[in-house]
Structure formats: C-alpha cells, structure tokens
UniProtKB/Swiss-Prot annotation:
This is Probable Xaa-Pro aminopeptidase P. GO terms for molecular function: metal ion binding; metalloaminopeptidase activity. One of its GO terms (biological process) is proteolysis. Its cofactor is Mn(2+). Mn(2+) 2 binds at residues 453, 464, 576. SUPFAM superfamilies: Creatinase/aminopeptidase (SSF55920), Creatinase/prolidase N-terminal domain (SSF53092). Binds 2 manganese ions per subunit. The keyword Mitochondrion does not apply. The keyword Magnesium does not apply. It holds the Pfam family Creatinase_N_2. It comes from Talaromyces stipitatus (strain ATCC 10500 / CBS 375.48 / QM 6759 / NRRL 1006) (Penicillium stipitatum). It comes from the Eukaryota. Belongs to the peptidase M24B family. Catalyzes the removal of a penultimate prolyl residue from the N-termini of peptides.
C-alpha cells in the first residue's frame, strides 16, 4: 500500500543539549526500476501565493510556543540537490532554487539566497517575503535576521535533522547573547502542512559501480579510511553524506534527481562495517558485491544504534572513551544521538578528501565521457543554428533542452542528465540558474544571446559544460563581455602554481579582466565535479568561499572553470570547461616542491563570432586556436555520416581571423 510522508500531529520540542527521539522517514512499500533516462523537472518563474501556508505554519508555531521557525534547503544528509519529498523550503516559500534558507517569524518571513538566484527569487517570492541577497553590503545574513526577529527572549525552532550540528551551535550562541533560545523540533512543521500532498520518498534499487569505472575496490577504500582512524585515534567514522557512501562502497543509486546516490548511513570502525539502508534497495548481486563483512541494517536504525555505539567506544591510553569521527556536514540530530561534542569529533571528511582526488581510471573516464559529451553538444548546436537560421523554425527553450537530451542519450554509457538543462535566450540568460518550463518559457531568439549550461551522467564520468552563442550579429558590448569572460577562462586554464595553493587563491585570475573594466559576476568560478557522482562535489572549488581556502588543490582534482557576466533584463554570458589538476614541468623548482597546472577535458567549440579578437593577446589567440584544433581532432570522427554537423564543427574550429 502506498502512503505519504506524513508527520504525526503531536510535535515534540527539545533544547540544544537534550536527546532526541527521531521518527524514521516514511517509506513506500515498493521499489521502482532503476532508470537510464532522466525526467527533467522544470521550474516555474512565477510567484506562488504562500499566504495560506504561512498562516498554517504560524498556527503550528503558536501551538509549540515558537516565535521563529527556520526552514533550510537541505535534507537529513545535507544534500545540495534533494528528493522532491524533502523540498520543504521550496514548498513554504515558492522559491525553487537549489540554495537558500527561509526564516518565518510570527509577523514576517525572509528568504536568503546567493547571487546565482537573486533574479529568480525576486520573481518567485510573493509579497509575504523579504529577499535577503547574501553577500551584498548592508544585507543581513539569515542568521542575523533570525536573531533580530528573536530579540527579547524569543524561541527559535528548527528540524534538527536538516541543519548541521556546527550551524546549530553557532546560531544558538548568537541567540543566547540576546536572551533567545534555539530548540530542535523533532517533527518537521512544513511536513505537517504539506500533508498527503507531499511526494513519496524514493526507494530505488542500488547498482554496483564496476571496478572498470571505479578504479579501486571498495575494500581498499575502507582500509585507507581505517588507517586514517588509527592516525587520528578515533573509534570509528560515521558517514552521513550520500555521495561519500556511494563512492566508498562502489555503488550508485537513483534516489535524488540527477545525482546517482541513495538514502543511507554507514559506520566504519577498525573491525566492523555497518551500512544503514533499506534492504529492499539491495539486489542479490549487490549483496554479493558487499560480502559478509558489510552488515546491512535498517536505514532508520542509525539513531537508535548511535547511543549504544558511543557507550561502548574503546578507551584511550588515558582511560577516556575514544571519540567517533564524523563529517562537519553531519546533522544536529545525528550529533545529539551520539552524545554531541563530548562523544563526536566533527571535521572535514577524509572520504570527501579522498573522493576529490580521482585515480587514473576515473581520470580516463572523465576524459572519455567529455569527448562523447562534446560531440553531443556539437551536434546540438549545429542542429539549433540550422533550425533557427536556415529553416526559420520556431523553437522554445524547452524544445532545445529536450533535443539536447535526446542527442546525448544516443551516446555510449549515457545514464541521464547531471542537472536541469539551463537553456536560455536573451534576458533569460541573465538568470544564472534559469530553468525553462513548457508553456511559460521563451521562444529562442536567433538575434539574441543563447546560453546553454548542461551536463550528463555517464557510467565513466560526469559532465558539466556551458556555452554561449549568438546565431546572428552580437552587439559590441556582448562581444566585449564575452571576450573578457573568455580571457578569464583562459587565465585559469593556463595557471601554474605551487602545490599547496587553494582555489580561493586562484579565483582572481578568472575575474581580473572583468575587474579592470569594473565588472564582475555573483557566483563562484569553479566547483569540484564527481566521477559518475554529484556534479557539485566538495571540498575543493575556485571562489571566495572561506572553505575553499582551507583545502589546497592536488593532482587528480577535477573542477569547473566557469567565469561569466550578466546584465539583468538584457543578456547573460558564461563559458565553462572542466579542468583537471596535474603536475607540470617548470624551468625551476623553487622550494623544491611540485608545481601544478590544469588539463581541460571539455571538447566543444567556443562561439567565435562573439570573440573580439583585438582584445586577445597573442598567447590567448594561440590558446583558442589550439583548443579548437583539439576539439576537431577528438570529436570530428563522430560525424563521418553527418555532413551538417561536420561542416558546422569545421566552421567553428577554424583559426581566429
């Protein structure tokens, strides 16, 4: 029998230091077949009337003596992209972007998000909401706005399963200074309002990720983790982040759109391996893959087991109980279940660090899948230009996105998309994470900028590519902006730097040419990319986030290189390649340390009619010509029977004039 993820009507409240009794997430009684194509979930760029939802939420807040309630974007595993049943912030606010935090008081409501979503949030939020543009001068953070609303000894509530323990502690300290208090609400209030309309929690089958793609047996990965535990003198590692579990066990799932992960937890000790996952997800083949050393336990039992695990922790030489280690992304609920900071060390995950450094098999897979993906993109752009210019066809943004997915699906090892395709024309290209919806999206204008940011999941890797084209005559400003963005992409692509350098330190390289003109973009320059895993992968990245300064780049890291420029209501430009860090030879070896550079793997032409060649240096012109020669060499063989695409590729990869 099918049933909805519906919370009980009685709500429990707990203070920061109190133990929690967590209810298991509801589960459907069936399993769906693992799919090999992706359903693309579109986003309405229209406002949703949230008055009734907010009224119901405030009534529940009143019943539970709450003055303020926080609704984060994340799920119980701190996933950036979530299953539809976990889209609570979207439900209560109407804002559909992937990042943001909603805060509701008895008299006001605010949503905080970053620069990728300023335009989208402004369009989607109704008059009940105040938009907090994160990072802008004079704009309160959501934590500051919460503290302001809670002044005078008020009570702030949050579901402890969807906020990290570190965030909860920091917010609690801030609130206590003003005489206020943070409490954890065991049953999510938004779930109460959503009720029977809340989507079912996915229960997809798990698949083995073969060694031919993984490159390393999962037993060796666990052995490496145990060495880390021995070095740190910890009793075990509690794994709560979904892509870390998928990577660690060489498994892939289908529980979250575009991300091949599955709902689970794991506990690794020097002697045991426990995987907390619904048994119905595991086929006999997967159980054989895991072997007898991996003990399968029910997904929801992690919280019940937590107390017992911490109670029987081995002793240190001094006789004190040894702590467990967990990621700094672990939820407040999980932390409290293990006994909090006294029993649990929260740190950057060693699994995350290891996963970010791809082995040679994974790197080869990333190279190979980007060649196939580049061929798919080339076929798409050739088709699109022919339809718009020669056939005078009328195509909307969704038509384009659907055609691109159709082309990709023909290629070897294709599984699905890695995120919603951003197919955007004219002013829509200025909406950084724009997602078109059939019926309300725009017709692609051949006389305007067209920006396409898209990616796919292949068995041997994950892709993410952005290209900006103009199929007619671009304006002088469009060409200038495009060329400045291109110069930034080249600057990062060709960077050479000593080992130990972080992505934080490299960010200015991609922005420098825009900065000289007084221009900039409100998003990071690059993010880590998984190997047939999440398209956004930590802990590395290129940008101004503080966490990017805490992790240096290493050979084997795979990141995006994607500077951009956007003029609201006019156009947007972004160029994105995927690049891999590697050791490079230099004339000298200052400090006797390795020096690193990048290898680009994206193989798709860069729109030449948008390049103002007079703004390029001799070296930059040579880079463009060399890049296009490489694209031709690696992808032209796909089009021996496709004259239209081959001719378009030849045109777009000619040396600059």
């Amino acid at each position: 029998m099918l049933f909805s993820c519906r919370a009980p009507s009685l709500l429990q409240r707990t203070a920061l230091s109190s133990p929690l009794r967590l209810f298991a997430p509801c589960r459907p009684s069936f399993s769906r077949t693992f799919v090999t194509t992706t359903v693309r979930f579109s986003v309405e760029m229209e406002t949703v009337n949230t008055s009734e939802r907010l009224a119901q939420l405030r009534e529940l807040m009143k019943q539970n003596n709450l003055d303020v309630y926080i609704v984060p974007s994340e799920d119980s595993h701190q996933s950036e992209y979530i299953a539809h049943c976990d889209a609570r912030r979207e439900f209560i606010s109407g804002f559909t972007g992937s990042a943001g935090t909603a805060v509701i008081s008895t008299t006001a409501a605010a949503l905080s998000t970053d620069g990728r979503y300023f335009n989208q949030a402004a369009k989607q939020l109704d008059s009940n909401w105040k938009l907090l543009k994160r990072g802008l001068e004079g704009v309160l953070t959501w934590q500051e706005w919460t503290a302001e609303q809670a002044e005078g000894g008020k009570i702030v509530g949050v579901d402890p399963s969807v906020i990290t323990a570190a965030s909860a502690r920091k917010l609690s300290e801030t609130l206590e200074k003003g005489g206020s208090k943070l409490v954890g609400i065991e049953q999510n209030l938004v779930d109460q309002i959503w009720g029977t309309h809340r989507p079912q929690r996915p229960s997809e089958k798990v698949k083995i990720h073969p060694i031919e793609y993984a490159g390393k047996p999962f037993q060796e990965k666990i052995a490496d983790l145990r060495k880390e535990l021995k070095t740190k003198k910890r009793a075990g590692f509690i794994v709560s982040v979904l892509d870390e579990i998928a990577w660690l066990f060489n498994l892939r799932g289908n529980d979250i759109p575009y991300n091949p992960v599955f709902f689970s937890y794991a506990v690794i000790t020097p002697d045991t391996v426990d995987l907390y996952i619904d048994d119905e997800k595991l086929s006999p083949e997967v159980k054989v893959h895991l072997g007898s050393d991996v003990v399968i336990k029910p997904y929801e039992s992690i919280f019940a087991d937590a107390k017992a695990l911490s109670a029987k922790a081995p002793l240190t030489e001094s006789g004190a109980p040894m702590k467990y280690l967990t990621s700094n992304k672990a939820s407040w609920a999980l932390s409290l279940s293990f006994g909090g900071e006294k029993k649990l060390d929260e740190a950057r995950s060693p699994i995350s660090d290891a996963k970010a450094i791809k082995n040679e098999v994974e790197l080869k897979g990333m190279r190979d899948c980007h060649i196939r993906d580049g061929a798919a993109l080339t076929e798409y752009f050739a088709w699109l230009e022919n339809e718009l210019i020669n056939k005078k066809s009328t195509l909307d943004e969704v038509d384009g996105a659907d055609k691109l997915e159709q082309i990709r699906s023909k290629h070897d090892k294709f599984v699905g998309l890695s995120f919603d395709t951003i197919s955007s024309t004219g002013p829509n290209a200025a909406v950084i994470h724009y997602k078109p919806e059939k019926g309300v999206c725009s017709v692609i204008d051949p006389n305007a900028i067209y920006l396409c940011d898209s990616g796919a999941q292949y068995l041997d890797g994950t892709t993410d590519t952005t290209r900006t084209f103009h199929f007619s005559t671009p304006t002088e400003m469009e060409k200038k902006a495009f060329t400045l963005v291109l110069k930034g992409l080249i600057a990062l692509d060709t960077a050479v730097f000593p080992k130990g350098t972080s992505g934080f330190a490299l960010d200015a390289l991609a922005r420098q040419h825009l900065w000289r003109q007084g221009l900039d973009y409100l998003h990071g320059t690059g993010h880590g990319v998984g190997a047939y895993l999440n398209v956004h992968e930590g802990p590395i990245g290129v940008g101004t986030r503080i966490q990017y300064s805490e992790v240096s780049l290493s050979p084997g890291n795979v990141i995006s290189d994607e500077p951009g420029y956007y003029e609201d209501g006019k156009f947007g430009i972004r160029i994105e390649n995927i690049i891999m860090a590697r050791e490079v030879e230099t004339p000298y070896k200052f400090g006797d340390k390795p020096w690193l550079g990048f290898e680009h793997v994206t193989m798709t032409p860069i729109g030449q009619n948008l390049i103002e060649t007079s703004l390029l240096s001799k070296e930059e012109r040579q880079w463009v010509d060399n890049y296009h020669a490489e694209v031709w060499e690696k992808t032209s063989g796909f089009f021996k029977q496709d004259e239209l695409t081959l001719n378009w590729l030849k045109k777009e990869t000619q040396p600059l004039k």
